[in-house]
């Protein structure tokens, strides 16, 4: 599948219990069929699973259930909508818990390093709605040495971690 670079306002999807890349075909299917099961039934797109990735050194368990995770930090606004769907049917999964965390616009993680202050900025949890969507208000993550800009994701179902991954933009 040809991968299309993600813009700041891109809808990022989690396919099955893992992150999915949205290629050119998926974008066309989304326009024509609205994405999700209708797009899959059309044959224009299927659920594509990505490999598990490390949670990295900056995970803090027990984050707050909240939509706005900025804690007032400045940066380019980003509304991140993640869809959790069944890998076999591409149908939405209601009630999954999506946990995200990332660096602030300056490339700093909350809870780590001198001057990080609050342990909660750019960290939060949302449950998916009936359409399988979890929405977060955040800022576009900043870059730091040795890594591409990315957002960490964990998906939980019935108390179990079913996916750990990272969302990033390809050059």
List where the protein language model places each region.
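N-terminal secretory signal peptides
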Residues: 1-10, 15-23
């Amino acid at each position: 599948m040809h991968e299309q670079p993600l813009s700041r306002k891109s809808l990022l999807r989690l396919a099955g219990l893992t992150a999915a890349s949205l290629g050119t075909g998926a974008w066309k299917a989304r326009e024509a069929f609205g994405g999700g099961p209708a797009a899959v039934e059309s044959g224009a797109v299927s659920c594509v699973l990505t490999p598990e990735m490390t949670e990295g050194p900056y995970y803090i368990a027990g984050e707050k259930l909240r939509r706005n995770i900025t804690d007032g930090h400045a940066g380019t606004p980003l509304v991140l909508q993640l869809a959790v769907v069944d890998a076999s049917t591409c149908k939405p999964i209601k009630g999954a818990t999506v946990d995200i965390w990332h660096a602030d616009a300056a490339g700093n993680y909350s809870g780590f390093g001198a001057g990080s202050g609050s342990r909660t900025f750019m960290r939060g949890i949302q449950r998916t709605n009936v359409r399988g969507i979890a929405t977060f208000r955040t800022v576009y993550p900043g870059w730091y040495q040795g890594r591409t800009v990315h957002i960490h994701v964990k998906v939980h179902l019935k108390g179990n971690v079913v996916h750990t991954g990272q969302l990033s933009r390809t050059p």
